[in-house]
From Swiss-Prot:
This is UPF0303 protein YBR137W. Present with 1200 molecules/cell in log phase SD medium. Keywords: Cytoplasm. Pfam families: HbpS-like. GO terms for cellular component: cytoplasm; cytosol; TRC complex. Belongs to the UPF0303 family. Disulfide bonds: none annotated. It comes from Saccharomyces cerevisiae (strain ATCC 204508 / S288c) (Baker's yeast). One of its GO terms (biological process) is post-translational protein targeting to endoplasmic reticulum membrane. It is found in: Cytoplasm.
């Protein structure tokens, strides 16, 4: 079960979370393995977590490989729009290019435009929360990118990070259960 930290959400909303703390959260977003079945299980887990935490909110969830191959895609309720797909693409592109969550990069960007800070087109990249890299503890490169769109950007980010960490912890517990 994923329970969002309301105090952390308030801090994210007010931008009172240092980049180092955001990076520490990202470092906890790792899985020991990542198969097609893991992608499906993770996506289903996140869909259920979104439905529990944000009933009746239309949210799009995407898990894709760095090469763009989509392993999982769903929405929670009717009402998501094609615009969510565009947000997913732009957030995912940001996380994969810069190696950090799209929220982290938005905080790092500060008040500058993407063009000023990073020399990228804001029509192609989104510096808003929701895209988080799925990492391996054995590699410097991500397995995939998890992207959520449809909530406020801080909620998208916290839902992605919290769900991924909770899923990883539950998977580890299952792996360690020798019964």
């Amino acid at each position: 079960m994923v329970v969002l930290d309301k105090k952390l959400l308030e801090r994210l909303t007010s931008r009172k979370v240092p980049l180092e703390e955001l990076e520490d959260m990202e470092k906890r977003c790792f899985l020991s393995t990542f198969t097609y079945q893991d992608a499906f299980d993770l996506g289903t887990y996140i869909r259920n977590a979104v439905k529990e935490n944000f009933p009746e909110k239309p949210v799009a969830i995407d898990i894709s490989l760095p090469n763009g191959h989509c392993l999982f895609r769903t929405v929670t309720y009717g009402g998501s729009a094609l615009d969510n797909d565009f947000w997913i693409q732009r957030k995912k592109k940001t996380a994969l290019r810069f190696g950090h969550s799209s929220f982290y990069m938005g905080c790092k960007k500060g008040d500058k435009t993407p063009e000023e800070k990073f020399f990228v087109d804001s029509k192609e990249y989104a510096f808003h929360g929701g895209a988080v890299l799925i990492q391996s503890e054995r590699s410097d490169y991500p397995y995939a990118c998890l992207t959520i769109s449809g909530l406020k950007q801080e909620e998208d980010h916290l839902m992605a990070v919290s769900s991924l960490i909770a899923f990883a912890n539950e998977s580890l517990e299952e792996d360690l259960n020798l019964d």
